[in-house]
Amino acid sequence: MQGGVGRYCKKLVDSLKNEGMQVFVVCNKDGKGDFNGISPNNQDNSKVLLKIVKEVEPDVVHVQYEHGLYGIHLDPLNPRKTHTNIESFYDECTVPIVTTFHSAYTFTQWMRLVVPLKNKLFGPLGTWIKMAYDYWTHLLNYESFNSLNRKKITSNKAGVVFSKYLAKIIPGSTLIYHGAEPSTSPPLNRNEARRMFSLPERENIALAVGFMTATKGWDIIGRMKVPDGWKVVVNTSRNHYGREKLRDKFENKGVINLNRGFLSDRDLSLLFYCADALILPYKVTSGSGVMYDGLAHGL
């Protein structure tokens, strides 16, 4: 997949291969892995994974665990029935599993995940009813969501997190900080990098990049009063795994929207070199690969 989890996984795979390990990657039909077949909409994800494990006979299975990537179902009546489409894989797999957790939330942040989704068929009433339903299912399932994480750390199952925040919420996990490094070396001159994106050379630039989702705070950027001498440069990418349909237009003279979608590692690195600062207006976050990328580029 494109985006943060995909890049994190690719960097890990490349590092393991550099150490002489044989690595097989399982992804969805659009990915470039060795096997495919998993998706948020496939209720048989566990069967797909168990079949591959039987065929490959690995020493260790590593799962990039972002719940929505495998299909998460919050039961509105019985929280014990809340699950993802890979729970039975964890129950039945006899090979040791290492899970990298990408999401865990405090109760306040968990409830902030509920965002209004416009209902074209029933209008404002439909939007309100859907919001009420989502609030109820989130309120009912906060503990069951956390238990999905906790159940994945047992005697032959280990968990990895990349921030102290996640480590506190997922007890028993091992903290390994999220790595990052520039994809262009040596560093490019800032003005030279800006010319490649047709960005102003005499103003300070605050950079905001990431998925076009409501919890990333793009609406905050649209309302910002940008100080003189500064521009906020935005580059969003489509979220293929959510239902949100957000406007990607920023009616703010202090905001420059590149509107280039997903960037290659090289182009993303060049974009970081354009910036004087990184802006993260997140409303909800468990961790931020963008933040680590920014640190790697001296921001």
Give short role names for the model-derived ranges.
Residues 52-81, 96-100:
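Short N-terminal targeting/anchoring amphipathic segment
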Residues 185-199:
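A short helix/loop element that forms part of the nucleotide-sugar donor recognition site in Leloir-type
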Residues 200-216, 222-227, 233-235:
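Conserved donor-binding/catalytic core segment of Leloir-type glycosyltransferases
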Residues 1-10, 69-77, 216:
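A short, glycine/small-residue-rich beta-strand->loop->alpha-helix junction that serves as a flexible
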Residues 234-236, 243-269:
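Nucleotide-activated donor-binding/catalytic signature segment of Leloir-type glycosyltransferases, i.e.
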Residues 1-32, 56, 91-95, 149-154, ...:
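N-terminal subdomain of nucleotide-sugar transferases
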Residues 270-286, 296-299:
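Acidic donor-binding loop of glycosyltransferase active sites
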Residues 128-188:
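Donor nucleotide-sugar binding/catalytic pocket of nucleotide-sugar-dependent glycosyltransferases
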